[in-house]
From Swiss-Prot:
Main location: cytoplasm
Species of provenance: Bifidobacterium longum subsp. infantis (strain ATCC 15697 / DSM 20088 / JCM 1222 / NCTC 11817 / S12)
Record keyword Lipid biosynthesis present: yes
Xref: SUPFAM superfamilies: 6-phosphogluconate dehydrogenase C-terminal domain-like, NAD(P)-binding Rossmann-fold domains
Compartment annotation: Cytoplasm
Signal peptide (residue range): none
Name by which UniProt lists this protein: Glycerol-3-phosphate dehydrogenase [NAD(P)+]
Residues involved in NADPH binding: W13, K33, K108, S142, R257, V281, E283
Gene that encodes the chain: gpsA
């Protein structure tokens, strides 16, 4: 039997995941602030602003701009809001979400200023117990999922039964979820790989080849694994779909906003110019400084994140960024 599921945020990924949930037989309500998007989804089953490639969304998807109406009957509430705005947006839903509902985060990022993961931000904002929070992460490029190309993901919750409930609610013929209790690992994977994707994209945009890209990806994986382990994550998580899988997809596709943003930087655009071309800032941009700060907090070296921070804040070139990665003593891998 299908569930009542609300998706907060009708961007490309939120809408694409809403379609997955609808295809799985659930009744889906999208919540958006923009009245134009609400009316488009509700009246025309289309999201021309954020996901124009899908001509018709399923009939069991609707939309509203009213917060209370959006969540009043929800069994599951999915959060697909830009990570850096999550806390401000979610506070408005405190006290509105039913006590039995599981809250699921699709967000990937570290909150700037607090260095907190999205699970911490969501739980603090909604005063939510750990067993009612779940996160979803994996190699999930929204355009491909919107086109119903086969894909897999990972659902993490400290309560395995609740992780399974969420996984069952988003299982379709083309979308396969796996479950884990390693929320910290999943959150760290989803957040930190965006910094690596920026760096790989920048190298590609500057004209560097496979060796350079492979070096950045591999060292980026080592960096995020070390950070995750220091934060209490299971290192195995970083070598599954949420880690290596997401890294491969994000670092190798022009569909990835982080990769594309980095590529534009590599071609010589400034951060401001790349933001305009990308129609917004990629999540990896505000996350980069937070990763550096988190590394300092956990006493874990973050050379790649540090060099990307210099790119974003000081405007150094790709060649200078790469030179910075080589300016260390010889160590074991």
């Amino acid at each position: 039997m299908g569930k009542n599921i609300t998706v907060l945020g009708a961007g490309a990924w939120g809408t694409a995941f809403g379609q997955v949930l609808a295809d799985a037989g659930n009744t889906v309500t999208m919540w958006a602030k923009e009245q134009r998007i609400v009316e488009d989804i509700r009246d025309r089953h289309h999201n021309a602003v954020r996901l124009p490639s899908v001509e018709k969304l399923p009939d069991n998807m609707t939309a509203t701009g009213d917060r209370a109406e959006a969540v009043k009957n929800a069994d599951i509430v999915v959060v697909a809001i830009a990570a850096q705005f999550a806390r401000v947006a979610l506070v408005e839903f405190k006290g509105l979400i039913p006590d039995h509902a599981i809250v699921v985060s699709l967000m990937k990022g570290i909150e700037r200023g607090t260095n907190k993961r999205m699970d911490e931000v969501v739980r603090e904002s909604l005063d939510l117990p750990a067993d009612r929070f779940a996160a979803i992460s994996g190699p999930n490029l929204s355009k491909e999922i919107a086109d119903r190309h086969p894909a897999a993901t990972v659902v993490a919750c400290t309560n395995l039964d609740n992780a399974t409930k969420v996984a069952e609610a988003c299982t379709t013929s083309y979308f396969k979820p796996f479950v884990t209790t390693d929320v910290i690992g999943l959150e760290m994977c989803g957040s930190l790989k965006n910094v690596t994707a920026l760096a790989v994209g920048m190298a590609r945009g500057a004209g560097y080849g496979e060796n350079t890209a492979a070096m950045i990806e591999t060292r980026g994986l080592a960096e995020l694994t070390a950070l995750g382990a220091a934060a209490g994550a299971d290192p195995k998580t970083f070598f599954g779909l949420a880690g290596v899988g997401d890294l491969i997809a994000t670092c190798g596709s022009p569909l990835s906003r982080n990769y594309t943003f980095g590529a534009n930087l590599g071609k010589g655009l400034t951060v401001e110019e790349a933001t305009k071309v990308s129609n917004g800032v990629a999540e990896g941009v505000p996350t980069t400084d937070a990763v550096v700060a988190l590394g300092e907090q956990l006493d874990v070296p973050t050379p790649l994140a540090y060099q990307m921070s210099r790119v974003l804040n000081e405007g150094i070139s790709c060649s200078e960024m790469l030179a910075g990665l080589f300016g260390h003593e010889v160590t074991g891998e």
